């Protein structure tokens, strides 16, 4: 979710003209099940009440299943939108990437093979993109299951996820994949927020039964180490968190 200035570029001209020409909007990337159609948008004037933008804006072409699940996007200071997404439920060793200047016309899609060094990896789920304004580079965090790598716990071996990350300045040269967080249980759907310098919050899903809820962890560095996960702050069966500052909240 990003607060967009000067409306939503050309999409505003096509669909949001009635909302006025010089307002700020929040934007949310989304998808419809079974996730083979492609990228969808929602917009809001206040961050609380949302409406959909009609249409599909990028059809997935990558991966064994050619899906677009969990799309995550940031905009950099030059006005470029950078998008990452899940390409398959299982079998792929990377995530999808594309960029755009106007949210309508997108670059060629690329598979970023972040788990190619771990050929037994079950999946690469829910990549979340973060722009590090201090290091002037992107960080992408995702969940993968590497059977036998971590203590099994109550989840079966092929559902025992941990959180990994890479950094890159251009999605051409990619850093070594590293483990970001092992909370001691299967975890997915992490998103990271910078509240201030040396103050980072990670919201993640505890994917173990019967939890299936959201927790938080804290760090003074983007790449950690992060604190032990908190107690859950949601009911069970909640996932896919997004965080945005709205006013003073």
Where do the PLM segments sit?
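Bacterial N-terminal signal peptides that target proteins for export
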Residues: 1-8
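Carbohydrate-active catalytic/glycan-binding domains of CAZyme proteins
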Residues: 18-249
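Bacterial N-terminal signal peptides
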Residues: 9-17
């Amino acid at each position: 979710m990003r607060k967009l200035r000067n409306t939503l570029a050309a999409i505003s001209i096509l669909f949001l003209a009635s909302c006025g020409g010089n307002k700020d909007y929040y934007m949310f990337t989304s998808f419809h099940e079974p996730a083979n159609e492609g990228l969808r948008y929602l917009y809001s004037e206040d961050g609380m009440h949302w409406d959909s933008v009609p249409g599909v804006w990028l059809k997935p072409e990558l991966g064994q299943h050619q899906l677009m699940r969990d799309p995550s996007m940031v905009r950099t200071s030059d006005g470029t939108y950078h998008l990452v997404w899940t390409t398959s439920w299982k079998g792929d060793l990377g995530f999808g990437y594309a960029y755009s200047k106007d949210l309508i016309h997108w670059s060629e899609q690329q598979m970023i093979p972040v788990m190619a060094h771990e050929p037994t990896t079950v999946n690469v789920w829910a990549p979340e993109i973060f722009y590090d304004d201090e290091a002037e580079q992107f960080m992408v965090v995702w969940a993968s299951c590497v059977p036998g790598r971590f203590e099994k716990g109550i989840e079966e071996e092929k559902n025992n996820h941990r959180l990994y990350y890479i950094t890159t300045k251009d999605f051409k040269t990619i850093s070594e994949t590293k483990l970001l967080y092992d909370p001691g249980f299967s975890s997915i759907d992490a998103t990271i927020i910078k509240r201030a310098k040396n103050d980072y919050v990670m919201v993640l899903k505890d994917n173990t039964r019967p939890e299936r809820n959201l927790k938080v962890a804290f760090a003074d560095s983007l790449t950690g180490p992060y604190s032990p996960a908190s107690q859950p702050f949601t009911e069970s069966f909640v996932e896919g968190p997004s965080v945005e500052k709205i006013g003073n909240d």
